[in-house]
A protein has these predicted regions:
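Conserved pre-catalytic core of RNA-dependent polymerases
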Residues: 1-151
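Mobile genetic element proteins and their domesticated derivatives, centered on retroelements
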Residues: 5, 17, 21, 25, ...
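Conserved, non-catalytic sequence blocks in retroelement Pol enzymes and Pol-derived host proteins
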Residues: 9-14, 38-47, 60-63, 76-80, ...
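Family-specific functional microsites
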Residues: 282, 286-289, 441-446, 450-564
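Basic, alpha-helical interaction scaffolds
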Residues: 178, 239-316, 372, 380
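Extended C-terminal regions of large enzymes
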Residues: 299-301, 325-330, 339-486, 490, ...
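Short, conserved micro-motifs composed of acidic
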Residues: 107-110, 211-246, 267
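Catalytic palm active-site di-aspartate
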Residues: 5, 37, 68-79, 133-137, ...
Length: 564
């Protein structure tokens, strides 16, 4: 039972009451909270804290900053242990004087008596009154918890102590996401001071951090970043020594003391393989007709790209080789969708489907996050952190990467501020597609003789992609010279003759000349329009017939040889 968790399913009346009170008080609460806790707050995201953490690690690893300790804490059963009186007192201290009224009293009164029943596999228990609780799953639960934990950040801010100075200037408070807490301090006395402060403040709220269980596992860890010191302090959590690790999971990402992205990428690659399997299962089980490619691309965007690129836009020092790992996995998905071999020219997927490579998607997301940063209030901790990094970059800083992105897309930094979110999104999308098209055409001209007959004017999905699955696959193979002809896979070997008539080379161009195929082919038209933007229905039928006839005759000849 110790690991069982649940949320409160509230009555409709209680939900409506909570929402009405929440709408009246939220803006006042949010405006008076510090930048320490981002949980349950609008227009704030886990990316904000990760962006700061990665930036500080990079400034230590690649800059001249002193070694630091990252102190990662998790509060044990936080919502179960929260004290309603303490949470409402914290809300009272947070809101302005004009909201010191009956609304706060109404929140308190509505949570004093809670008739709770537990739903389990065998039914439901009888209802018992559990007084004065913070309801996890209710409207007020997350913001009450975030505001209560935010008092730690406020005390650091107001007392001007237990914060980290980024590049000696920007004050970084302890970073929290509801009940997940990350403290940053220079290794030494400052680290001990922060550790003592956080532990004491949590105990004063009648809460506890996780301590090692009977198996020695704990959710509270210390990551040392930078050169090791002889007097690197031992930190404690409620009297128990804090475990020191090389990396730890925080807000969904793996934070590594060496500042590298390798473990995050390995984790996302593994996740991506599972997502590809799920996508292909869906596509193969359901008959989608002419919507096959459209739905496949929607699944690629929503499940695959969003699944593997979570937070990737704020990673520091992301190398091209690391991006290529993602693109390799992406092409694996596209290969399975189009049923083509590994040797298919990689630029052909994007030019034929009208989609963007993963690397350019990351660039787009980086610029969108840059737009978010530039439009923050100048008093915001995150904005000050960003401006310091923009003006005083360290090798490997995020701002160096995004400067290159702006240059690639032809967007000026000083024009970002003031642009609407909708406008910048459209501008980035337009410029990204132009940039991607130019890069893909360079690859086509440089690397791929197979695509020599194909002409493109812009990056868009080819019209034949609205055909059925079988037609799309066969046309794509013919256009990219990946159909099952010997000359398409010669790779330096001697010429291949047609296995059916042995009178000409076994290639796509000569397939209509084959006597064996001509005897069974109903249509005699030219199929040169296969390389154009408008492919006729007759050409599609001829291609399907050629593939079908070749397969049948080759299988027949193979069977005859075995029988003989």
């Amino acid at each position: 039972m110790n690991n069982d968790r649940g949320i409160f399913i509230l009555t409709v009346f209680k939900k409506i009451l909570d929402k009405l009170l929440y709408f009246d008080l939220y803006d006042d609460i949010d405006s008076n909270m510090s930048a320490s806790n981002i949980g349950a707050r609008k227009k704030r995201n886990i990316k904000n804290h990760l962006f700061i953490i990665y930036g500080i690690i990079n400034s230590v690893v690649n800059g001249k900053e002193d070694p630091i300790d990252l102190q990662i804490y998790d509060i044990e059963k936080c919502f179960d242990a929260l004290w309603l009186d303490d949470c409402l007192n914290d809300i009272y201290d947070t809101v302005s004087a004009e909201n010191h009224n009956d609304k706060l009293a109404l929140i308190y009164e509505s949570n004093q008596e809670n008739l709770v029943a537990i739903r389990h596999p065998l039914g439901m228990t009888t209802r018992e009154n559990i007084p004065n609780i913070v309801q996890q799953g209710g409207t007020w639960g997350p913001i009450l918890c975030s505001n209560s934990i935010d008092t730690l950040g406020k005390k650091c801010r107001d007392r001007k102590e237990n914060f980290y100075l980024y590049k000696g200037v920007v004050k970084i408070l302890p970073l929290a996401m509801v009940d997940d807490l990350n403290g940053i301090a220079k290794c030494g006395i400052q680290s001990i001071s922060l550790n003592t402060f956080l532990t004491t403040q949590i105990e004063m709220k009648k809460l506890r951090f996780h301590v090692p269980d009977e198996k020695g596992k704990t959710k509270c860890h210390k990551i040392h970043v930078g050169s090791q010191r002889e007097l690197c302090p031992i930190l404690k959590v409620h009297g128990t020594e804090m475990e020191m690790v090389e990396d730890d999971t925080y807000l969904g990402d793996i934070i590594s003391g060496d500042g590298k992205n390798s473990k995050n990428i390995q984790k996302r690659i593994s996740k991506g393989i599972g997502i590809i399997s799920s996508i292909m299962t869906l596509l193969n089980k359901i008959c989608l007709g002419e919507f096959y490619i459209e739905i496949a691309m929607i699944l690629r965007e929503s499940m695959f790209i969003n699944g593997i690129l979570t937070n990737a836009e704020i990673w520091y020092n992301l190398k091209q080789s690391e991006i290529e790992e993602f693109e390799l996995l992406d092409r694996s998905l596209l290969r399975q969708i189009l049923q083509v071999p590994l040797t298919t020219p990689k630029e052909s997927y994007y030019l034929e489907l009208g989609i963007l490579p993963i690397g350019i998607v990351i660039k787009m997301r980086r610029i969108r996050y840059l737009h978010y940063l530039t439009n923050l209030k100048e008093t915001e901790m995150l904005h000050q952190f960003f401006i310091m990094q923009w003006n005083n970059p360290t090798k490997g800083d995020w701002t160096q990467s995004v400067r290159e992105d702006l240059n690639d897309f032809g967007i000026k930094f000083n024009e970002l501020k003031g642009m609407s979110k909708r406008f910048i999104k459209k501008l980035i999308k337009k410029n990204a597609r132009e940039y991607a098209f130019n890069k893909l055409m360079e690859m086509k001209e440089k690397n791929s003789s197979k695509l020599g007959q194909l002409k493109y004017k812009k990056l868009k999905r080819q019209t034949y992609m609205k055909q059925t699955k079988k037609n799309i696959i066969n046309i794509f193979k013919f256009r990219t010279r990946m159909a099952d002809f010997g000359e398409n896979y010669r790779a330096g070997y001697d010429a291949f003759l047609c296995p059916l008539c042995l009178e000409h080379l076994d290639n796509q161009q000569s397939s209509l000349k084959c006597k064996s195929i001509q005897d069974e082919l109903k249509f005699k038209n030219d199929i040169s329009d296969i390389y154009s933007n408008e492919i006729t229905d007759e050409t599609i039928q001829i291609i399907n017939s050629i593939i079908k006839i070749r397969k049948k005759l080759i299988e027949r000849d193979s069977t005859a040889e075995v029988t003989f």
